[in-house]
Amino acid sequence: MKVLVLFSVLFLTLFSYSSTEAIDEFDSDAEDDMLSLMANEQVRAKACTPRLHDCSHDRHSCCRGELFKDVCYCFYPEGEDITEVCSCQQPKSHKYIEKVVDKAKTVVG
């Protein structure tokens, strides 16, 4: 029984050592691949639409505020049922949350 326990401990030790060697080799290869991909990366961010500007061309292009992204709201002007007007606006709940965070920052320091 003691011999069986001794061999199982020896086997587990060798197995864990061999698996860590394989993981280390895999990590170094993955790091090299990641570095080569990052070197070839190009910036492809498109320009965002500022607050209160027309966003009808792309409703997901509104810029970010201090904490949250602005939302594209679409509506029909009073008296017109045909033309839809869209603009990037900050929701009131986000405005209130940003005010609370600003007040907390000034109080805390």
Curated annotation (Swiss-Prot):
Tell me one Pfam family matched here: Toxin_35
Residue span of region Linear cationic cytotoxin domain: 89-108
- What's this protein's name? U4-lycotoxin-Ls1c
* Cysteine pairings via disulfide bonds: C48-C63, C55-C72, C62-C88, C74-C86
Region described as Knottin domain: spans on this chain? 45-88
Q: State the GO CC annotations.
A: extracellular region
Q: Which residues form the signal peptide?
A: 1-22
Q: Name one GO molecular function term.
A: toxin activity
